[in-house]
Curated annotation (Swiss-Prot):
Catalytic subunit of DNA primase, an RNA polymerase that catalyzes the synthesis of short RNA molecules used as primers for DNA polymerase during DNA replication. The small subunit contains the primase catalytic core and has DNA synthesis activity on its own. Binding to the large subunit stabilizes and modulates the activity, increasing the rate of DNA synthesis while decreasing the length of the DNA fragments, and conferring RNA synthesis capability. The DNA polymerase activity may enable DNA primase to also catalyze primer extension after primer synthesis. May also play a role in DNA repair. GO terms for molecular function: DNA-directed RNA polymerase activity; metal ion binding. This is DNA primase small subunit PriS. Signal peptide: none annotated. The gene is priS. It comes from Thermoplasma acidophilum (strain ATCC 25905 / DSM 1728 / JCM 9062 / NBRC 15155 / AMRC-C165). Keywords: DNA replication, DNA-directed RNA polymerase, Magnesium, Manganese, Metal-binding, Nucleotidyltransferase, Primosome, Transcription, Transferase.
Length: 322
């Protein structure tokens, strides 16, 4: 597996995230060793590292530091951080009953809602400040680079996650989230009002009506984000254009206007994995997955499959190389 990953990194020049010299960089090897607290100064240094180490996973911090290679967080001298949202299909209700394709479609829809209904409509974040990435496996990462968010502390970011998830949905939380980012009125109050409907005059509505409307609003309009990823101001996140070690797929940027049609199992296969075939061994029956328009084998035993399929099955733990 490591040789296949090394080929990808040797045949591609990976562009680093902006201001890479101020970010902590880390990676995990195929032997399970975690290397952190690295400082990378430029594109050349990054690609030399990737070609030499051929890592299983690659990360960079959302935060900007004066000394990113210091091992203790206080000594790094935090100077701000991008605002990051992590959406994982494993968090979907009933995900264990869904196919991989169904899970990815649902989490893609959640990502669209986050971007259009919350980040753009409610928070007023311009499209130019938003970047969406397929995580390389089960979901999406949304990065916000905007002057209004860089210096937000953990508590302020937690308020934002509470607003988006609807976990503390009441007038106080909604209003504080809106005021914090200086956005127009609307958002949850408008959604709850719509759920209340016009069936009865406002002065005749009972408290129970409001509670039911809030419950429906939360169920129908909230987004399932992994909140700790957002409010942890020292979080490291997968580096764009690197490979995910549990799938062999690329952590790839998705244009906002293309998200609705995006198919990661077609568009995130490395070119280096499209040629050739490998033997894999399935120790037990599996639920088949479809990658690159090809359905995987499902019965136990030895199978000859395309390289990208072999990488995915082995990386995800479904198969081994014999």
């Amino acid at each position: 597996m490591i040789d296949l990953f090394r080929r990808y990194y040797r045949e591609n020049n990976i562009d680093p995230p902006e201001l890479i010299s101020k970010r902590e960089v880390g990676y995990m090897t195929f032997s399970g060793e975690v290397i952190r607290h690295l400082k990378i100064n430029n594109r050349f240094e990054l690609n030399m590292l990737l070609r030499d180490a051929a890592p299983m996973h690659v990360y960079s911090s959302a935060a900007y530091y004066r000394k990113p290679d210091e091992r203790k967080m206080p000594e790094k001298e935090w100077g701000g951080a991008d605002l990051i949202f992590d959406l994982d299909s494993d968090h979907l209700p009933g995900s264990e009953k869904l196919s991989q394709k169904e899970m990815l479609i649902q989490i893609r829809d959640q990502t669209e809602r986050l971007v259009s209904d919350f980040l753009i409509a409610d928070f007023g974040i311009p499209k130019s400040s938003i970047k969406i990435y397929f995580s390389g496996n089960r979901g999406y990462h949304v990065h916000i680079s905007d002057d209004r968010v860089y210096r937000l502390g953990s508590d302020a970011r937690r308020e934002i996650t509470d607003y988006i998830t609807g976990n503390s949905l009441d007038e106080t939380v909604v209003r504080r989230a809106i005021d914090m980012l200086g956005i127009a009125s609307g958002g949850w109050p408008a959604v709850v009002s719509k759920e209340l409907g016009e069936a009865s005059p406002a002065n005749q509505r009972r408290e129970s009506d409001l509670r039911k409307a809030i419950k429906r609003a939360r169920e129908n309009h909230s987004v399932l984000i992994d909140s700790p990823v957002t409010y942890d101001i020292h979080r490291i996140i997968r580096m764009p254009n690197t490979l995910h070690g549990k799938s062999g797929l690329i952590v790839k940027e998705v244009e906002i206007d293309h998200l609705g049609e995006f198919d990661p199992f077609q568009e995130c296969i490395p070119d280096q994995f499209r040629d050739g075939e490998y033997d894999v061994f399935l120790p037990e029956k599996i639920k088949p997955v479809e990658i690159g328009g090809i359905e995987s084998p499902k019965m136990p035993g030895k199978h000859r499959v395309k390289t990208f399929m072999a990488v995915y099955l082995v990386a995800s733990g479904r198969a081994v190389f014999p």
